[in-house]
Structure formats: structure tokens, C-alpha cells
Amino acid sequence: MKRQSLETIHLDKIVGGGQALGTLADGRKCFVWGGLPGETVTVRITKKKSHLVEAVVEEVISPSPDRIQPRDPDSYLSTSPWQIMPLEVEQTYKAQLIDDAFALHNVTLPAAIDIYCDNVAYGYRNKVEFSWYSESVVSRAVSQKKSGLVSGPELFSDNNQDIDADSDREESSGDTLDLAFFRRGSKGKIVIDGTSLAHPAINNLARAIRNLLRHKRVAARQLKTLLVRCDQSGSCVWQLYVKDRLPEIITATEAAKLPAQGGEIIYSDPRSPASRITERLALFGNTTLTDAILGIPFRYACEGFFQVNIPVYEKALRDMKEWVSRESSYWQLEHHQKIIRDPRKVAQIFSEVLLAADRPTLDLYAGVGTIGLTIGSGNVTLVEINADAVREMQRNITELDRTDAHAVLAPSEQALDYITGREIVIVDPPRAGLHTDVIATLLQQLPPRIIYLSCNPVTQARDVALLQQNYHIVHHRGYNFFPRTPHIEHLIILDKKP
């Protein structure tokens, strides 16, 4: 049996990844999940490096006054590690992390950080991917428990090396399966019945599929994941990813009885851990969902990209729209009049503002078009690298009869000719931030305004630090798209310097 590595440490602060930070006796930094600043805790080391370690809390010796009981005590570390703090405390930490990110890159934000939240902390997710856990492993653990080898919460713990949720040789084709999440910091799994983050319809459908498969004598080693998605009304679609070609594991009659509008069985190459589509084995019902964003309907596939917290996303879009509209252009004129004394310069800016009100819009990293097609101008170009997303985008453009919208299938860094300096540019990049070629072209062509929505304030701050040579920040705001998690969205409006 592998020996556990336990340490008792004091936690000092929350850091960018969402962990609490402490220091081991040997001076190495310890990044801890499940802890809060000010606490003294015993942690289990999950990863060791020469200059740092990662760990999870095993015991809280001296709790923070902010600590609360997590809604999902067994699985919260896997999905939403900030369930241990009140929502208002979470808001404070998220503002702090944004501030820290920009301070790291010597970027001064012009106002105090405001984090918008609609105060819906649970039940907001419209998409969840579940893993599987074979009942035969649990049966083996139960027999050990009866003999005194395993007890209490250790039943599904990584502490017992004889219980390996990932070991195919421990599984059999028994009658029972369980839904599961991967345990943070290990390869083990945690048996679940659902997650409090999800829309209730998602949990209900996942349990229904689990209950159906329990009678199929199928082992977890034959399955990869279950992806469930719902629209705002609670109508669901599902995709069952399998490692063996099992097209009849769910029949059409059985699928029709599930609480879903449609679903698919998908063979996914077992050589890859990711749930990628290798072959579509069976299709049931209608697997395309439709949701309205700011009153505009969008179609999207179960596996496609779409926002998981639509109400908060819509608030971000409304805020962004103000900076595409004529009203925000006049705000820009008023702002410059206060700082520029030369009347000829003011007249030039006034002329530019009138033109800006009717400028085209360029939406980079556009996804299925939910930004450009809702808040973009009458002339909008949308650039996206994912072919499936572009197909959905083009379908949305056609159904909306948007003859003034143009979809481009390309990486943003290979669509630089669309940055001409005339358009308002909207960017919503992945966590890696803007490609260096995109930044270089923006600095060369100098569009009048850049609207930058980011899911990673650290890379956003890095990019803004480079853009600041020709741009200044006129507005910023944070958004809590993912309550109970460390993830943050942050909006920056950059205007070209006069």
C-alpha cells in the first residue's frame, strides 16, 4: 500500500488557480484545495515538484469564520471547490483575483472591481459530463468493509489502494453502474447521484439513463462518459460515449421513454481519454437545442460550445452592447472633451465618433455567434476556428436572415486581414488569451475600440499590458458565470488613445 504524505500547514491566501496557499516546513509552497485563508489544516499531498506541492484538505484543525458546509460534501472538490464559502465571500475573492492579475502585469484598472452575480449559486449549469463507476468495485469494497478493512468515508477514498476506480481488471459485467466524477488530484472516482450545480432536469435524465443501463449488464470499462445538456426550459438532450461499439445498448423504444427530446450513442476511440466523436452509432429524436439570447434564437448541438449560464451571459452582453451603440460613442466624445483642450482635436474626434456609430463589427473567437449576432452592428464578420461551431453559426445566420453577417472558418491569427482599423473589434478568446499575431495586428491597424471579454484575467491582463501602448481602459467589469468555482469572466473596454 502506498504511504500517504500528510502535512499540517497554515493557509495564507487564495491564489489565481483558486487554491489556498500555504508554506511547508521545508519552504516549498503548497497549493491546497478545500481550504480557506486563515485556516490551519492537515493536507494530503497529491503532487510533488521541486519547488511546490499540490494538496487537498484532509482535516480542518482551525476553521475560518467564513467556512460553510458544502452542498455536495462528497464531490464538491471535483466540480465546485468554493462551495465551502458564502457567495458574498466568493465575490470578494474573485474581485481580488482580478486585481492581483492586473497588478502582476502592472496594469492599473480605472475603477474598483465590480463582480456581477445574479445570486443563483446552484442549479445554473445547462451542461454536465458524467463519468461511470462499476458496481462490482463497490461490491468488493463493501466486502472489505464487512471484514474490517475499510470503514466510513474511506469506502470511496484513494487512501485504500485496493479500490481502483480506473482498473478494468477489477470490473465485471454486473447489473449495476453508478454515475461518477473524477476525484481532484488523483485518477480515482467518486460515486454521485447528481450535482447541485446542474439544472434539475439534467440530474433527472442522468439518473434515468443510469437506471436503464443497470439492467443491460454493461461494465463501466465499456463506457466513457455521459454528456447531458438542457435549454432554459429544461428540455434535455444526451450523448452516451462508449468505448465498445454498442449501438443497441439503448433501443429506440427505451430512448423514447427517457425524459429527453433526443439523444445519441457515440463510439469514442478508447485510446483517447477525451470524449470525442469517432462514429455516431445511433440517433434518437431531436438532438438540437434552441435558446434565446437577448431575444434572438440560437441553435446548438449537444457537444457544441454554448454558454452554460445564460442569464449572467446576457447581462454581460447588455453591458457590451452599450459600447457598440451610438450612446457609448457620445460618451467617448464627452470624455475626450474633458481632457483635450485643442478644439481642432475635439472636432476630429467628433467626426470619428459619428463614423463609429455605424462602424462594422469584427467578432473574433466567435463560437456560434452569440456575441456578434446579438450586439454587433448591421455589418458583422464572425471568425471561428471550430468547424462544427461555424456550421451552427451559419445556420443561425440563415435562420435569422442576417444577410449582413459573414461567418469565417479560420483561426483568428489567420484572419488578420479582417482587422482593417475601421471596425469595432470584439474578442472572447480561450484561456490562453489573444494570439501574439492578433495583438500585433491590432497595434498596427488601430481599430477605434476593442471589446475584450475574457475567461482568464491573467492572460487578459498580459494582453492589455501590450495593448496599452496605443489604448486605454475606459470600462471594466467582472461576471460570476460559474458560482461556487474559482472561474471568473472579466470585460475590458479599450479605446484608442487620442
What does each model-identified segment do?
Residues M1-D74, G174:
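Terminal RNA-binding accessory module
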Residues K2-H10, G16, L155, H215, ...:
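Rossmann-like S-adenosyl-L-methionine
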Residues E58-R71, Y76-V138, K145, R169-A220:
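Extended interfacial segments that mediate partner engagement and assembly in macromolecular machines
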Residues I113-V120, T225-R229, G478-F481:
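Short, solvent-exposed loop/turn elements at beta->coil junctions and helix N-caps
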Residues V137-V138, V142, V150, I163, ...:
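Short hydrophobic transmembrane-like helices used for membrane targeting/insertion
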Residues R140-S157, Q161-I163, D168-S173, Q332:
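Intrinsically disordered, low-complexity segments enriched in serine/proline and basic residues
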Residues G188-K224, C230-D231, D244-I265, R271:
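Internal alpha/beta scaffold segment
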